[in-house]
Amino acid sequence: MKKLLLIGVLALTMGQASAQRCLPKMQGIEVNAGFVDGKPMSAAFCGGAALSTYTKNGSKWVFGGEYLQRDYGYAETTIPVAQFTAEGGYYQKLLTDGSKTLFVYGGVSALAGYESVNWGETLLDDGARLTDKDSFLYGGAVTLNIEVYLSDRLALTGNVRERCLWGNDTGHFHTQYGVGLKLIIN
């Protein structure tokens, strides 16, 4: 009778185990893309890749690189401003569901990189000269990040982020909205 009861209990609890996600030292590679400052993607876009390493409380360290381009209108043409940045930051887990399918993070990051205005060309087609120059950037970002796990190794991500960078002539603040895919590698 005890064996029958044990088999019955085991049969009823099969499939009830939660997924083991965001365990300490797990790592994931993320690729993302988005738009900047509420402009259409043809005028302002960003993309990047990052490596996340999870800590014991489900939070994560993030290290990555990003490309951001915003086109500014001038007469009949546009002037591209491109930023290449490296990021290092900590994202604190704010919320998760019981099945560990949805995670919400808030994070802060340090950023450093380079900004190119019109790819270094200061003379425009109509003879005007740009006073903004290429420069090195430094600053930080505040991020709200969401991960929705599609399987144990694949997650859909979304983020909203505000970047604040100094050292440039073209504006300090940029708001980014993006989506991405994350692959857990170990």
Give the ranges of each region predicted by the language model.
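Cleavable N-terminal export/targeting peptides
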Residues: 1-25, 186
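Short glycine/proline- and aromatic-enriched beta-strand/turn motifs that initiate or cap beta-hairpins
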Residues: 19-70, 182-186
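Extracellular loop and loop/strand-boundary signature of outer-membrane beta-barrel proteins
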Residues: 34-37, 73-79, 126-132, 164-168
